[in-house]
């Protein structure tokens, strides 16, 4: 992933670097939508709808897993196109959400290879998630303390990521339309609306002042599934930080999916690297939205006396929009959330 609070902190920090443009204005107006967008596909890991539908006989893979294992360019292209088809306040909400989603990809694809290395990940081996989640929770504590001077326990997700009914409808409907196209997930709009509203509530349950909630969950998991699954995600008020997870000693690590890619970068190095990647993505996203707006405006001003001239201008505008979209998709890079490698070059996890 990296963890929920690391993504939240990344969003807070990178916002300061963004230029004052159309995208940043939308984020400013809909900050909680942006914060939720920063959680990317992870919101679906906290959504009970998929397990319930499977129990009812509808064989559906978890959308969060599906998105993490699929090429990303088609999703981001459709998200940007659908966002530009919206108008007014709806479009502002969608821009803020997509901007956050871009941040999730930037950090995941940049930092995940290091995390997989130090958690000794092996494809197909059960029990990896417990180690992975514990490692990322340790990073959550370190990053929140470094940048926000507070514990993840003190970050109230219901306040920071809770959307209004209107915002959740816009985001839910947007996801419903795009996921139907990209992942053949033809579910109800209400399911997506519930998923985005449910996430801040569910994650607030993973905060424990005394640690009692975590211990109870551990007992249940041991009894039911034989190992810890979600309990490592519970954050406590008092927690002994393990700063070694940041690799500030710069130990060597390699990409599990392409072992010749070796690095000694720390998590903080990767955090800063992801910022630069993200800012380029947002600049390209902003340019496409501007080109689209100008194109619509010019089209409404045409009349029969300037039809030929208008047609030529329309072609030029289309070329500019295509270039802007290409630039945006280059920034996205079709990079895997897990390996950071491009699906355009070879099949990856």
Predicted regions and their residues:
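N-terminal leader/auxiliary helical segments
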Residues: 1-100, 105-349
